[in-house]
């Protein structure tokens, strides 16, 4: 089946309510979302498989938990490394190679005879996953108008949300019924389906006439707005996952929710994430800073409420849904913001966003672990998470002020150029 042609991007000047903005997403973007579903399921499914893996591999549960940390660290490191390594390679070819390596990593994990090989397979999978996110995001952005970037990213992030709603619980069910290795086989099969979709539906995106230069791409890191975007993304994600990573013991030990209901509550978080991604993706293109400010503020309020009312089951369960909604409501805007300020290096921008999210996903649980080790209780992880999101909110305010200041400078420069051109075009005055 022939690949779809690349849609012609609409002019950036069209308003968000225009026909271009309302146009349907290319099917290729949904194929990327399907691929992210496989990636996300693999990343998060170990939460429900750790006891079985620990028992089968003869290691402790904390040692098995290092498999999760290894994946997150691999994502942080792998995204920029692979973005640089594949900078001059065709995007479609790179996606095919990365999803293939990722799928083989799942098969290797399913067949791993010992903990060391399973650990190695997780690192390989994480590197491929990170590279796919970075390149896939750049491809998705390239196929849509500038004023539809957040919607395109919402489709990709939606794959991650669906992984939380369906993939992770299904992985746990497979693990309970057929053993933990069956979950790895299932993700391998999903990766194969994604590979077919990429082969048949992702267009060949021509390389730029001038080959990308690493030095030029790295210049984006001189921009304070890029650094602010990195910090905001890491802190916003870290604040949520500081509490979410320990939601199960909080529910069972503090709220006294029956352990059998925990998977349903985790699924409720995923439903909130899916709804938040959908809403955020639709409004972020027109109101990017509004989404960031309102979403991170909401996450802060919900985390504080969780810390205060963690012992009340109904409130704790409701807040699990709301935290998922607010966290993923901001995700499309966080992605789009990075592409807006780092547009001169789209692949590195995607890689930087991936690393930023996973830096938060690593730092947040680490901070939560310190809080628990200090005997402050599971509910205190929500206080720590709220502290992180407050800092993120402050940095968004700084970024907004800087953005307004830069916009005024650009507007004044444009007015001056127009005035100079008008003066040059007017007939010279003739003295009587």
Q: Residue ranges of each PLM-predicted region?
A:
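Helix-loop-helix hairpin linking two adjacent transmembrane segments in secondary transporters
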Residues: 113-117, 132, 145-203, 250
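Helix-to-loop junctions at the C-terminal end of transmembrane segments
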Residues: 79-91, 276-288, 372
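Helix-breaking motifs and short loop linkers at transmembrane-helix boundaries and internal kinks
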Residues: 58, 90, 111-117, 128, ...
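Conserved MFS/SLC helix-loop-helix module at the cytosolic interface between two early adjacent transmembrane helices
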Residues: 77-116
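A late C-terminal transmembrane helix in Major Facilitator Superfamily
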Residues: 341-377, 385
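C-terminal transmembrane helical hairpin of 12-TM major facilitator-type secondary transporters
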Residues: 290-334
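Paired small-residue
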Residues: 101, 105-108, 116-125, 314-322
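Juxtamembrane intracellular "pre-TM" segments in multi-pass secondary transporters
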Residues: 14-22, 201-230
């Amino acid at each position: 089946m022939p690949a779809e042609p690349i849609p012609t991007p609409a002019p950036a000047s069209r308003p968000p309510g225009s026909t271009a903005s309302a146009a349907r997403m290319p099917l290729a973007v949904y194929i990327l979302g399907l691929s992210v579903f496989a990636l996300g399921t693999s990343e998060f499914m170990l939460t429900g498989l750790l006891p079985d893996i620990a028992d089968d591999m003869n290691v402790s549960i904390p040692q098995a938990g290092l498999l999760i940390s290894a994946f997150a660290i691999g994502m942080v490191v792998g995204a920029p490394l692979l973005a640089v390594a594949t900078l001059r390679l065709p995007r479609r070819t790179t996606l095919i190679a990365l999803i293939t390596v990722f799928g083989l990593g799942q098969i290797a994990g399913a067949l791993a005879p010992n903990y060391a090989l399973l650990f190695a397979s997780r690192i390989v999978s994480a590197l491929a996953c990170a590279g796919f996110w970075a390149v896939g995001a750049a491809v998705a952005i390239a196929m849509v108008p500038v004023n539809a970037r957040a919607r395109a990213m919402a489709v990709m992030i939606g794959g991650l949300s669906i992984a939380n709603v369906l993939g992770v619980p299904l992985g746990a069910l497979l693990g309970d019924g057929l053993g933990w290795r069956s979950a790895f086989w299932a993700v391998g099969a999903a990766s194969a389906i994604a590979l077919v979709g990429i082969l048949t539906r992702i267009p060949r995106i021509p390389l730029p006439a001038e080959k990308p230069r690493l030095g030029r791409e790295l210049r984006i890191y001189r921009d304070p707005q890029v650094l602010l975007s990195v910090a905001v993304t890491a802190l916003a994600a870290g604040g949520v996952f500081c509490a979410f990573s320990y939601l199960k013991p909080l529910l069972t030990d503090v709220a006294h929710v029956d352990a059998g209901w925990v998977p349903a509550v985790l699924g409720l978080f995923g439903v909130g994430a899916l709804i938040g991604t959908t809403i955020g993706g639709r409004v972020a293109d027109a109101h990017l800073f509004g989404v960031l400010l309102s979403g991170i503020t909401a996450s802060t309020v919900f985390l504080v409420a969780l810390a205060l009312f963690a012992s009340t089951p109904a409130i704790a369960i409701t807040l699990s849904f709301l935290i998922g909604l607010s966290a993923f409501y901001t995700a499309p805007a966080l992605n789009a913001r990075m592409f807006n300020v780092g547009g001169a290096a789209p692949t590195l921008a995607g890689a930087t966003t991936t690393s930023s999210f996973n830096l938060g996903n690593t730092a947040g649980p680490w901070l939560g672990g310190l809080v628990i080790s200090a005997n402050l209780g599971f509910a205190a992880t929500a206080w720590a998470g709220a502290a992180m999101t407050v800092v993120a909110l402050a940095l968004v305010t700084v970024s907004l002020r800087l953005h307004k200041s830069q916009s005024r400078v650009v507007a004044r420069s444009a007015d001056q150029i127009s005035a100079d051109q008008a003066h040059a075009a007017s007939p010279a005055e003739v003295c009587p």
